[in-house]
């Protein structure tokens, strides 16, 4: 374990403090994730400041532990080369960038649903209902298909279907819009990317894995895994994979910018 540097220590303490305050706030009914977590831009809970605050909020102790372990493990070595100001700047920028990319990807994923909603209410037909139902996992395909078939046969009237979905669509939007992303993972993945570039051949001795893996290979494999799970929409794990990739991407672009402007690693 590397010696804890000043910037990494400050970030570590800030994350722990917010976590403890969140536990205390729960007793008063204050939901820290609803106030500091990052929401989709069309959510009623969205605030621009959440692009910064979300990275200091964690979903639980293990979420906090693994992010802070990585912060200390990778961040201290990076800070010892870059210095505190540059290190903290990089951490915050990659965290914000990860949040921005997460929101962009979320918007792209929700566009088919939002377009299908508009199309359905503009021209409510059984086919438009099927398109609406298959545009989001909120609605079960089999149930929508059965509902559309009954509508076609006259079992339900146009007015009944429209009235039902006028009530269900706001609920579906709330479910899709009002799930916040929290955690320092985006910034941590930015640190991981920087570590792999700065110390490519240094072998990482990971928890639960007794074999050392060169940092450059670990970063590549981890990035590929995140891309795979993100593309496959592996939402069952409740992990914002594209936020992780966003932290790596923003970190890479920032380091590339520094290199081209005469600021090397050392």
Where are the language model's segments positioned?
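A detector for small-residue-rich transmembrane helices and their helix-helix packing motifs
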Residues: 1-266
């Amino acid at each position: 374990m590397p010696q804890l540097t000043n910037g990494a220590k400050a970030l570590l303490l800030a994350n722990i403090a917010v976590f403890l305050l969140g536990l205390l706030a729960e007793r008063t009914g204050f939901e820290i994730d609803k106030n500091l977590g990052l929401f989709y831009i069309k959510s009623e809970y969205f605030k621009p400041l959440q692009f910064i605050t979300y990275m200091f909020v964690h979903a639980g102790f293990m979420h906090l532990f693994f992010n802070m372990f990585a912060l200390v493990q990778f961040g201290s070595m990076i800070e010892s080369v870059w210095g505190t100001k540059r290190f903290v700047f990089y951490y915050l920028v990659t965290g914000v960038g990860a949040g921005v990319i997460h929101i962009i990807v979320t918007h792209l994923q929700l566009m088919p649903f939002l377009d299908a909603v508009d199309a359905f209410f503009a021209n409510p037909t059984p086919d438009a209902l099927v398109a609406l139902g298959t545009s989001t996992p909120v609605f079960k395909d089999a149930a929508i298909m059965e509902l559309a078939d009954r509508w076609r046969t006259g079992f339900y009237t146009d007015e009944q279907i429209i009235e039902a979905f006028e009530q269900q669509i706001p609920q579906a939007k709330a479910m899709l819009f009002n799930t916040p992303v929290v955690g320092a993972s985006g910034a941590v993945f930015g640190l991981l990317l920087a570590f792999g570039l700065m110390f490519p051949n240094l072998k990482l001795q990971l928890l639960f894995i007794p074999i050392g893996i060169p940092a450059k290979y670990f970063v590549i494999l981890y990035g590929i895994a995140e891309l795979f799970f993100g593309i496959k929409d592996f939402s069952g794990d409740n992990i914002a994979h594209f936020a992780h990739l966003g932290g790596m991407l923003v970190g890479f672009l920032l380091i590339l910018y520094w290199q081209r402007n005469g600021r090397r690693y050392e």
